[in-house]
Amino acid sequence: MKIMIMSDVVPAASAKNEYTDGAIEKLLSDGFREKLHGAEFNIVNLECPLTRENEPAAKWGSSLKALPESMKALKKIPGLVVNLANNHIRDYGSQGVLDTIQVLEEHGIPYLGAGKDMENSNRSLILEKKSHKIGLYSC
């Protein structure tokens, strides 16, 4: 089983239009796209919520977010699995987390590391391909 792991994906700032237009191919080199297509699963650490929430949570440091339409590009990653356990997922509070989960569920994207409640947040995720199985846990 081939797995790619990508960290700190933030579909905002200078690349916002490519993500919201679904043009992820403009952001990735040919060689990297080949590697993505060669993997059964591509695990992405989504380093921000996908939300329209405008009020950031009270915290020290920058608050990151991306538009829900960013999923147009992200869903083009084959075998996409999203990790949400990171220091920016709550930058726009609980609403930002819930909005992100809703977008992922609407697109049938498996995720881990956050949830609608504690039970869902603490669940593991089992990925299976043919005779191979791998368990993931992120908190």
Label each residue range with its predicted role.
Residues 1-139:
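Acidic, metal/ion-coordinating pockets
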